């Protein structure tokens, strides 16, 4: 029952945060198509709904080898410390750019964030900024005082969700 309620909350938060971002969202989704089923299968095997696929769309445009200026790597833009903490035991410390290892580490981190942040808006912002950084900013309930970049992240995420490629 909790999972059904959480999935409904995910959908409503994303639906209610729609902004005009359609052209970019469409191109991101097209680029992600070859990896979509594999990413969704991994997320679901880790106990997460398929909607978290859209984090990879927003974070990296599904580019496996992309590295941010902050050093975050791969599909889900996982930092090295986060990867090392949440990676599966069969993944080496150097597999951060591997599709499966990056996705599994991200999924495990998301599950950790679900326990810390009860509403979806804050969870998505915490994923982008880091849970500890979000808490340092003060109000995690509304994520007050966050940069424009992080605030627009939720807009990108929600728009990509609204243009979702049908899953199963």
Describe each PLM feature range.
Residues 1-25:
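Classical Sec-dependent N-terminal signal peptides that target proteins to the secretory pathway
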Residues 26-168:
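Catalytic glycan-binding domains that act on GlcNAc-containing polysaccharides
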